[in-house]
Amino acid sequence: MQRFFEANPDYFRIVNGEGPRPDEARTEFTDLPPAGMPYRKMSLLGFYDDAGTLIAVATIVADFIVEHVWHIGLFIVATALHGSGVAASLYALLERSMIDQGARWLRLGVVQGSTRAERFWQRCGYVQVRERGPVAMGQKSNLLRVMAKPLAGGTIAEYLALVERDRPGSP
């Protein structure tokens, strides 16, 4: 996974202001949500092509803060595959899996100004529910667009009633 991160540094440059750290992959296994943000399970997923090459990585947090809210912490697709439709296909599989496991709402944070990512998540049906920040990330301080997507008949209003921290204007 470290080689994958080093071969695809764009995400890290945009988010952290520098390429992946030498221990970047290891930290994906040890970084946990902050205290006071309960969750049921955290998963690190790798997606491979037919030749066995790692082409994407995702981290998912199940029942994040409240039951049925799942958080996508990371979703990186190999730079060479950008614009090919692979990211949308992989995301569709990931979303289906989360629904099958009980997700009713999905949430994520996108660095404001990361235009490609912002457009991708909007095309996937996510809407901004608030801004958070500035948040220190590596060598940068970023504003985050907190985005959510209701599933299985859920609504954004129901989501915001459950997840107080994502309500506009909350601390």
Model region roles, listed by residue range:
Residues 71, 102-104, 143:
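Short loop/turn motifs at secondary-structure junctions
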Residues 98-109:
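Conserved GNAT acetyl-CoA-binding A-motif
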Residues 117:
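Helix-turn-helix
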Residues 57, 111-112:
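Short amphipathic helical patch at the helix-1/turn junction of helix-turn-helix
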Residues 3-82, 91-93, 97, 134, ...:
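Acetyl-CoA-dependent GNAT
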Residues 107-111, 122, 127-145:
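Conserved catalytic-core motifs of GNAT/GCN5-like acyltransferases
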